[in-house]
C-alpha cells in the first residue's frame, strides 16, 4: 500500500510538471508539488490532490479508493463499505477489498455475508453445502438439515417451527398435541389449564323469599370462588353455589316500628268499633225486651178485661 501511495505521488509530480510546461506560468525558483496539499482538503482528508482526492486521512479514518474510469479517487470514511474490510497501521488505515465471493467480510479469508448464489459456512462462501447441511435462502447460510415436519430448526434434532397443520412440542413436530397439552395461536403445544375452585363456605341463614320468619321450611345457600379459569380445552368450572332445604321453628314476623304503631292504632280502632257495635246491640236487645214486656203486659190486661166482661155477662143472665 505504501508503494501504491508513492506511485500516486510520482504520477501527480509528472502531471504537475507537464501542466507547468504547457502553461509556462510557473517559475523554477518556486517549484513544488502543488497538486498535493493539506490546504482546503475536505471530508476528513489530511492531504489531498485535485486529481485523486484524498491521499491520506485524519486519524481513525479509513482511506477508500473509488474507481472513476482510469482514475482512482481517494475518500476518507469512518468505516469501510460493503465488500471491503478495514486494516489499521501506525501510518494509515486502509479499506481492503474482500474476496470476490464475499459481500461482506471480517478479513480477506473470513466472509460475513455472501453474494447471491453462495451460502456462508464457517466464514467461507460455498455454492453447495457440506453433507448434513442444507442451504437456507432466508439466512443465505448452510444450516442443519431439519427433522421431518420441521419448517425451521435450531439443529438437526430441534425444531423451532413446524410445517402447516402440525404442532410444536419440546422441539418436535406432532400431528396432535400430547395429553394434557393444547395448541395456541402459534401452533405450539402448551400445558392445559384446568379450573380450580376454593372450598365451600359455611351454609347461610335459612330463609324463604328473602325472609327469615313466618315459615317452617326454607332454603339455605353456600358458595365457593373460582381460583383459576380453565384454558379452552381444560376442565370447566363446577357450580359455585349450592342450595338445600332447611327447617326452622316457625315464628311471627315483627313488622317495622312505624308499621307496628299503625297496626296498633288500627287494632285499637277495630276494638273500639266492636265495642260500640256491642253496646248498640245490647241497647237494641234492651229496647226489644221493653217492647216485649209492654206487649205482654198489654195482652195480660186485655185478657183480664175480657174475662171480667165474660163474668159480668154471665151474672146478668
Curated annotation (Swiss-Prot):
<feature type="disulfide bond">
    <location>
        <begin position="206"/>
        <end position="213"/>
    </location>
</feature>
<feature type="disulfide bond">
    <location>
        <begin position="80"/>
        <end position="95"/>
    </location>
</feature>
<feature type="domain" description="TSP type-1">
    <location>
        <begin position="194"/>
        <end position="254"/>
    </location>
</feature>
<dbReference type="InterPro" id="IPR044004">
    <property type="entry name" value="TSP1_spondin_dom"/>
</dbReference>
<feature type="disulfide bond">
    <location>
        <begin position="102"/>
        <end position="111"/>
    </location>
</feature>
<feature type="disulfide bond">
    <location>
        <begin position="57"/>
        <end position="76"/>
    </location>
</feature>
<feature type="repeat" description="FU 2">
    <location>
        <begin position="92"/>
        <end position="135"/>
    </location>
</feature>
<dbReference type="Pfam" id="PF15913">
    <property type="entry name" value="Furin-like_2"/>
</dbReference>
<dbReference type="InterPro" id="IPR043601">
    <property type="entry name" value="Rspo_Fu-CRD_dom"/>
</dbReference>
<dbReference type="GO" id="GO:0005109">
    <property type="term" value="F:frizzled binding"/>
</dbReference>
<feature type="disulfide bond">
    <location>
        <begin position="129"/>
        <end position="189"/>
    </location>
</feature>
<keyword id="KW-0964">Secreted</keyword>
<dbReference type="InterPro" id="IPR000884">
    <property type="entry name" value="TSP1_rpt"/>
</dbReference>
<feature type="glycosylation site" description="N-linked (GlcNAc...) asparagine">
    <location>
        <position position="184"/>
    </location>
</feature>
<protein>
    <recommendedName>
        <fullName>R-spondin-3</fullName>
    </recommendedName>
</protein>
<feature type="disulfide bond">
    <location>
        <begin position="98"/>
        <end position="105"/>
    </location>
</feature>
<feature type="disulfide bond">
    <location>
        <begin position="41"/>
        <end position="48"/>
    </location>
</feature>
<comment type="function">
    <text>Activator of the canonical Wnt signaling pathway by acting as a ligand for lgr4-6 receptors, which acts as a key regulator of angiogenesis. Upon binding to lgr4-6 (lgr4, lgr5 or lgr6), lgr4-6 associate with phosphorylated lrp6 and frizzled receptors that are activated by extracellular Wnt receptors, triggering the canonical Wnt signaling pathway to increase expression of target genes. Acts both in the canonical. Wnt/beta-catenin-dependent pathway and in non-canonical Wnt signaling pathway.</text>
</comment>
<feature type="compositionally biased region" description="Basic and acidic residues">
    <location>
        <begin position="274"/>
        <end position="303"/>
    </location>
</feature>
<keyword id="KW-1015">Disulfide bond</keyword>
<keyword id="KW-0732">Signal</keyword>
<dbReference type="InterPro" id="IPR036383">
    <property type="entry name" value="TSP1_rpt_sf"/>
</dbReference>
<dbReference type="GO" id="GO:0016055">
    <property type="term" value="P:Wnt signaling pathway"/>
</dbReference>
<dbReference type="GO" id="GO:2000052">
    <property type="term" value="P:positive regulation of non-canonical Wnt signaling pathway"/>
</dbReference>
<feature type="disulfide bond">
    <location>
        <begin position="195"/>
        <end position="237"/>
    </location>
</feature>
<dbReference type="Pfam" id="PF19028">
    <property type="entry name" value="TSP1_spondin"/>
</dbReference>
<dbReference type="GO" id="GO:0060612">
    <property type="term" value="P:adipose tissue development"/>
</dbReference>
<dbReference type="GO" id="GO:0042481">
    <property type="term" value="P:regulation of odontogenesis"/>
</dbReference>
<dbReference type="GO" id="GO:0002040">
    <property type="term" value="P:sprouting angiogenesis"/>
</dbReference>
<keyword id="KW-0879">Wnt signaling pathway</keyword>
<keyword id="KW-0677">Repeat</keyword>
<comment type="similarity">
    <text>Belongs to the R-spondin family.</text>
</comment>
<dbReference type="InterPro" id="IPR051514">
    <property type="entry name" value="R-spondin"/>
</dbReference>
<dbReference type="GO" id="GO:0030178">
    <property type="term" value="P:negative regulation of Wnt signaling pathway"/>
</dbReference>
<feature type="repeat" description="FU 3">
    <location>
        <begin position="139"/>
        <end position="183"/>
    </location>
</feature>
<feature type="compositionally biased region" description="Basic residues">
    <location>
        <begin position="251"/>
        <end position="268"/>
    </location>
</feature>
<dbReference type="GO" id="GO:0001974">
    <property type="term" value="P:blood vessel remodeling"/>
</dbReference>
<feature type="disulfide bond">
    <location>
        <begin position="114"/>
        <end position="125"/>
    </location>
</feature>
<keyword id="KW-0716">Sensory transduction</keyword>
<comment type="subunit">
    <text>Binds heparin.</text>
</comment>
<dbReference type="GO" id="GO:0008201">
    <property type="term" value="F:heparin binding"/>
</dbReference>
<keyword id="KW-0325">Glycoprotein</keyword>
Amino acid at each position: 500500500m505504501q508503494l501504491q501511495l508513492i506511485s500516486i505521488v510520482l504520477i501527480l509530480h509528472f502531471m504537475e510538471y507537464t501542466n507547468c510546461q504547457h502553461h509556462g506560468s510557473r517559475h523554477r525558483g518556486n517549484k513544488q508539488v502543488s497538486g498535493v496539499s493539506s490546504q482546503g482538503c475536505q471530508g476528513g482528508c489530511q492531504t489531498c490532490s485535485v486529481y485523486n482526492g484524498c491521499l491520506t486521512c485524519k486519524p481513525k479514518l479509513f482511506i477508500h479508493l473509488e474507481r472513476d474510469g482510469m482514475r482512482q479517487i481517494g475518500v476518507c470514511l469512518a468505516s469501510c463499505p460493503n465488500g471491503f474490510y478495514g486494516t489499521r497501521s501506525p501510518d494509515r488505515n486502509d479499506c481492503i477489498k474482500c474476496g470476490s465471493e464475499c459481500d461482506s467480510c471480517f478479513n480477506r479469508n473470513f466472509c460475513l455475508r455472501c453474494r447471491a448464489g453462495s451460502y456462508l459456512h464457517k466464514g467461507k462462501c460455498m455454492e453447495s453445502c457440506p453433507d448434513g447441511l442444507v442451504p437456507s435462502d432466508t439466512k443465505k447460510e448452510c444450516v442443519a438439515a431439519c427433522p421431518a415436519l420441521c419448517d425451521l430448526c435450531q439443529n438437526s434434532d430441534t425444531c423451532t417451527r413446524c410445517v402447516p397443520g402440525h404442532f410444536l412440542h419440546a422441539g418436535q413436530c406432532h400431528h396432535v398435541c400430547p395429553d394434557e397439552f393444547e395448541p395456541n395461536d402459534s401452533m405450539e403445544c402448551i400445558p392445559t389449564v384446568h379450573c380450580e375452585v376454593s372450598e365451600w363456605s359455611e351454609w347461610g341463614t335459612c330463609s324463604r323469599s328473602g325472609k327469615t320468619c313466618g315459615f317452617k321450611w326454607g332454603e339455605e345457600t353456600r358458595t365457593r370462588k373460582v381460583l383459576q379459569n380453565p384454558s379452552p380445552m381444560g376442565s370447566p368450572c363446577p357450580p359455585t353455589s349450592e342450595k338445600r332445604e332447611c327447617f326452622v321453628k316457625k315464628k311471627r314476623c315483627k313488622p317495622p316500628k312505624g308499621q307496628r304503631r299503625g297496626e296498633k292504632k288500627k287494632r285499637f280502632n277495630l276494638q273500639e268499633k266492636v265495642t260500640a257495635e256491642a253496646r248498640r246491640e245490647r241497647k237494641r236487645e234492651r229496647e226489644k225486651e221493653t217492647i216485649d214486656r209492654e206487649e205482654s203486659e198489654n195482652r195480660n190486661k186485655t185478657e183480664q178485661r175480657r174475662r171480667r166482661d165474660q163474668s159480668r155477662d154471665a151474672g146478668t143472665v
